[in-house]
Amino acid sequence: MAENSLSDGGPADSVEAAKNASNTEKLTDQVMQNPQVLAALQERLDNVSHTPSSYIETLPKAVKRRINALKQLQVRCAHIEAKFYEEVHDLERKYAALYQPLFDKRREFITGDVEPTDAESAWHSENEEDDKLAGDMKNKVVIAEKEAAAVEELNPKGIPEFWFTIFRNVDMLSELVQEYDEPILKHLQDIKVKFSDPGQPMSFVLEFHFEPNDYFTNPVLTKTYKMKSEPDKADPFSFEGPEIVDCDGCTIDWKKGKNVTVKTIKKKQKHKGRGTVRTITKQVPNESFFNFFSPLKASGDGESLDEDSEFTLASDFEIGHFFRERIVPRAVLYFTGEAIEDDDNFEEGEEGEEEELEGDEEGEDEDDADVNPKKEPIQPAECKQQ
């Protein structure tokens, strides 16, 4: 038993351990009071940061070399991706030619040049509620038809104001349209998208076809959007696909006194010496949708645009892209409002998800027991990029 007590350490060992601990504390205090030691520790802490770039700086040179090799591979991936989008553009051009006969037929129906056959105009709703409502209304329709038999049936040509109605329905476009633009847009008969020819730089043209009118002589107004599908040499990792980089409009041949993009103002001037007053007139720019055909130019001389100009140009690019991707391919659905309802439902769904998340967070603050760990995660909304 005595041997075991000695091996386990006696009072003398405890005293020695306490003395060592005290000495260690004193030594630590002395070290921490040394300004040079504190400076070295602070420098060490400053270098250890949670930001990725700071972390990379702390890596050995050999590891940094391998990371540079990975970046080289990433640049090569970006160039392959650029080629992929170029081929996608070629496919878009190919299928645009297949769509065009259908769009030409659409124009004929809209303008009234061709009347659709019974087979072409037959449309069966998939909405049961609409079908039921249609059935309930049959008798009323029959009665109404009998009452209208004595009255000449109105039958306007084609679909009046088709494209103007789309402009009015779509917020992005209606914001551009002034009251004095409306009579002109009622003459718009068609909008087409034309892609650049094979082997030419990527671009597309929006063609706005107008019937003869009292405002300008051009049968077609055009807007060309130039695109780029290659990584930026200065920042190759920012590449995310083709982007619109510039656009060109066209000259509108306005008839006398019909140019809505300018307005005439009168200004009185007083002569300093004689005190006489004269009235002068001058033209100043006027807000109008038709300024769309006189766009700002992207800076090509290395000088950056001011913030307002950059915003205006970016908005222009967005509108051009929207015409190409949404309005022209799905025109009838924007005319009826169905496409707009789909867009609104999509946005409301996103807002609902945010509200639900906020509600969950509040619940966690009040009572953690209400948290359901098996709740399915909210899926991110799908986003389409250019």
Curated annotation (Swiss-Prot):
Residues 1-28, 339-386 are annotated as: Disordered. Residues 339-370 have a biased composition (Acidic residues). Polyglutamylated and polyglycylated. These 2 modifications occur exclusively on glutamate residues and result in either polyglutamate or polyglycine chains on the gamma-carboxyl group. Both modifications can coexist on the same protein on adjacent residues, and lowering polyglycylation levels increases polyglutamylation, and reciprocally. Polyglutamylated by TTLL4. Phosphorylated at the G0/G1 boundary but it is not phosphorylated in S-phase. Phosphorylated protein remains in the cytoplasm in a complex with histones during the G0/G1 transition, whereas dephosphorylation triggers its transport into the nucleus at the G1/S-boundary. SUPFAM superfamilies: NAP-like. The keyword Oxidoreductase does not apply. The modification Phosphothreonine is found at residues 51, 58. It comes from the Eukaryota. The modification N-acetylalanine is found at residue 2. InterPro entries: NAP-like_sf (IPR037231), NAP_family (IPR002164). Its main location: nucleus. One of its GO terms (cellular component) is nucleus. Keywords: Acetylation, Chaperone, Cytoplasm, Nucleus, Phosphoprotein. The modification N6-acetyllysine is found at residues 105, 146. The modification Phosphoserine is found at residues 5, 7, 49, 53-54, 125, 304. Gene3D superfamilies: 1.20.5.1500, Nucleosome assembly protein. It holds the Pfam family NAP. It is found in: Nucleus; Cytoplasm. A motif (Nuclear localization signal) lies at residues 265-271. GO terms for molecular function: chromatin binding; histone binding; nucleosome binding. Interacts with core (H2A, H2B, H3, H4) and linker (H1) histones. Belongs to the nucleosome assembly protein (NAP) family. Acts as a histone chaperone in nucleosome assembly. This is Nucleosome assembly protein 1-like 4. The gene is Nap1l4.
